[in-house]
Amino acid sequence: MTKYTFKPKNFKAFTVDGLDARMEALNERVRPQLNHLGDYFAQYLETATGEIFYPHVAKHARRSVNPPKDTWVAFATNNRGYKMQPHFQIGLFENQLFVMYGVMHEAKDKAQQVQAFVDQFDALRNLPSDYSVSLDHMSQEKTYIHNMTDEDLFKAFRRVKEVKKGEFFVARTLSPNSEHLKNDKAFLSFLEETFEQLLKFYK
């Protein structure tokens, strides 16, 4: 029995129709792992940074009609919420597991927060080839950093500063059949390796 990782059947929770039925499927097939990952990586981040991190598992409480197309656990140093500050996420869509760190459009002082990526531009450029950028946390679409020009990246930074909906996340993704998801040991190793890279941009 696995505690942390996700199998293809877990991703299938997103194929269940209807809000109530999908929420029930997510609560049964996905939320237990997110809760365990929340506890594990809150401690991991505290050890790595010396700061206390709080896990926030998505509840989707505001939804009344449309079922969620993704779900996640987020990590931030604020125990009341995470959207207002740069934060880490582990989550999944039907066809993608994602690990991200960045700035959401709701964040306070977005222009100042995205500056961490500008200041660490060389580190961003030198990330392994499977790292990507997400400009919208609600979309599965992400662009590999090695396929982006410097101008593409600086345009993305400017968008965060100038556009209300502007966001910037550095991400790493897996398909549901990835070898990194075959067992807890492989998955935790993948996640720790990813967090180690993402922490380069944490101030």
UniProtKB/Swiss-Prot annotation:
- A Pfam family found in this protein is DUF1054
Family matches, as InterPro entries: UPF0637, UPF0637_domain_sf
Q: Which Cys-Cys disulfides exist here?
A: none
Q: Which SUPFAM superfamilies match?
A: YktB/PF0168-like (SSF142913)
Upper classification of the source organism reads: Bacteria, Bacillati, Bacillota, Bacilli, Bacillales
Q: Which organism is it from?
A: Staphylococcus saprophyticus subsp. saprophyticus (strain ATCC 15305 / DSM 20229 / NCIMB 8711 / NCTC 7292 / S-41)
Record protein name field:
UPF0637 protein SSP1683
**Which family does the record claim for this protein?**
Belongs to the UPF0637 family.
